Amino acid sequence: DPTVLQVGINLGNILLVTGKKANGDPEGIAPDMAAAIAEKLGINVKFNTFATPGEVADAAERGEWDIGLIAIEPKRAEVIDFCNAYVQIEATYLVPEASSFQKVEDVDAPGVKIAVSERAAYDLYLSRTLKHAELVRAQGLPGAFELFKREKLDALAGLVPALRDNAADMPGSRLLPGRYTAVKQAIGTRHGKPALKAVVQAFIADAVSSGFVQGLIDKHGVTGKLAVATDD
């Protein structure tokens, strides 16, 4: 239906989808960005929601959305044409208070076991970059946190805002300073949609430079947890 923009939304990112409207539509920065793009195109918006980013990526192959709001990741680029990022979230580790680790780089050592949410952008990143440490995967962030506690693993990989919440729930744990990556949250189109991609790309550039994105960060109460994307 050319009068409707089908949008793939990842409900698993609680910073970008912060709630639900009375009509059941998702609420937050990601839905607001998508709605603004639909408005620019002069068409209606329809949200197709998924529990995890991996499911959003899988749905691209089935043609279930026109634009998807999901973190940029080389593996996902096989099925998605990414535009530039609009926000970024830094990723680090949560470790036990008594851990010898003092900075992010210390964690990649032989024998180290890291709990991680399966197929999260930082799981894909760490899978490519870790030389020695072993990733132990669980379903979703809550699952990775439980695994970390239950199995007494050496570290929990995650995004700073979520790890802060985990640390508050787990006395005797601390976040390592620094980051191993910043997850870039972007908007992508399915392959073979160059005209739509051009519109989205132009919209993001304007939204970042005009302060529209920062305004959404403030509006949805995630200031200090999300940052407007940088080019690095």
Can you annotate each of these PLM segments?
Residues 1-71, 76-78, 210, 219:
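Extracytoplasmic small-molecule ligand-binding "clamshell" domains
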Residues 4-11, 27, 105-120, 134-135:
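Short loop->beta-strand "edge-of-pocket" segments that line small-molecule binding or catalytic clefts
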Residues 6, 42-44, 61-70, 111-113, ...:
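Alpha-to-beta junction loops
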Residues 11, 87-98, 160, 164-205, ...:
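Periplasmic-binding protein-like
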Residues 31, 46-58, 101-102, 136-150, ...:
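Short helix-initiation/N-cap motifs at beta->coil->alpha
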Residues 54, 70-79, 125-128, 149-181:
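A ligand-binding cleft/hinge motif common to bilobed small-molecule-binding domains
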Residues 84-86, 95-113:
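Flexible hinge/capping segments at coil-to-helix
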Residues 121-138, 175-176, 205-232:
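Ligand-binding clefts/hinges and TM-proximal coupling segments of bilobed small-molecule sensing domains
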